[in-house]
């Protein structure tokens, strides 16, 4: 069928093809295989049934939005993106310094009022306003337009008084979002597939219409998602770690002194594992096979790739119901396996019982449930907060977790970005009280965390937000994958076990990277023989 054409407010239109519902990976489309930077995949699955909920693939982008402190840079990636810069220049907030330089629009936001009360600070002008302005410019009466991207852990220092880390080098922006040019959106619950092209520069119509037709033809002709298997017999043995077990255990002991002194009740230190990764996409596919999780994501930003399979949502907001939700995870045990590495059901159940009866784990989890309730109290209507699925156990490839779900109705004057600002960073990656815990983490961890512990997901012009915490993930730069993992520390934590927990959490990703490297080596050897 021919593409339907929908108007987009003031800045062009979109072309849309409704396709037969298929469970297809973007790799089946040549534009994904051939594309370079500025593309993203975000998959959501049901925790219990493992059934897919939604898959969004930004196949190509026209505008890239980066935030570094008070500076937001909107960079046009082609003529289609350039057509957006003029209306965005006109929509620049009055208190913001705006500079247009060719394909780049630079907005500098004023310093936040540090002495304002909490409600005024929440409503104050911040760099997050740039995302609202972009979505407002793209607003579509015929259906929401979305952005896909990343909030880093270090975005928090724009809103809270955090010390500078010992290592001042920064590699990851406070946030990075992409405005899609070509988008594949699969609603698995409604069994509906849509392929969309957004035309902001009329001169680019023919190019985008042709790309849309090509993708639609490929989509119809491609085979369904192949039943791949994880590479067998792989162990992640050649990784390096920035803190060895003994050093990490000593760090845990120093942080326990702060717990003892009453500075914090809980804190979540982390360490970084690294190993070579020549093919991030292949490593991502291996991770999904080995560690099927509710959120799976792949972001190619050009200067780095980020991929992961995360068990934990960051913040979800449904604009229609106005429900905002957090999903704290705290309390971990390894999966029960026999000598061959297969799941031993009896041992697995014993480990679950041990987890459910562990007073330290229960106390740690309830502390973070209370923190989530307190975070939502800042932005929700009074009397609407509730805790669901209290102390449920979710199982993943290498570990099992205690989880709960905390929800409430967002205050009528606030939106999803207000809610995210109030709740960042998620307590399960920080500790409690949150600000003091973040300050101590800056003091004891060497550098910026970057993507780890932040959030990745989609935000649309209707106001919806769906994000995953960036954990069980790898940030790949210059052929090296860095996998960060943390552990919740309380007064009676065993430092040795906390070091072991970080390793267990990192192993799913490290093993996937090792499997991808072996797969690549075997493929190269086969081609050499051929």
Curated annotation (Swiss-Prot):
Mg(2+) binds at residues 364, 501. One of its GO terms (biological process) is phenazine biosynthetic process. Changing residue 337 to C: In strain: PAC174. Substrate binds at residues 331-332, 452, 472, 486-488. One of its GO terms (molecular function) is metal ion binding. The keyword Thylakoid does not apply. Its cofactor is Mg(2+). Its EC number is 4.1.3.27. Binds 1 Mg(2+) ion per subunit. Changing residue 111 to P: In strain: PAC174. InterPro entries: ADC_synthase, Anth_synth_I-like, Anth_synth_I_N, Anth_synth_I_TrpE, Chorismate_C. Pathway: Secondary metabolite biosynthesis; pyocyanine biosynthesis. Keywords: Lyase, Magnesium, Metal-binding, Virulence. It catalyses: chorismate + L-glutamine = anthranilate + pyruvate + L-glutamate + H(+). NCBIfam families: PRK13564.1, trpE_proteo. Belongs to the anthranilate synthase component I family. PhnAB is not feedback inhibited by tryptophan. Heterotetramer consisting of two non-identical subunits: a beta subunit (PhnB) and a large alpha subunit (PhnA). This is Anthranilate synthase component 1, pyocyanine specific. It comes from Pseudomonas aeruginosa (strain ATCC 15692 / DSM 22644 / CIP 104116 / JCM 14847 / LMG 12228 / 1C / PRS 101 / PAO1). The lineage of its organism: Bacteria, Pseudomonadati, Pseudomonadota, Gammaproteobacteria, Pseudomonadales.
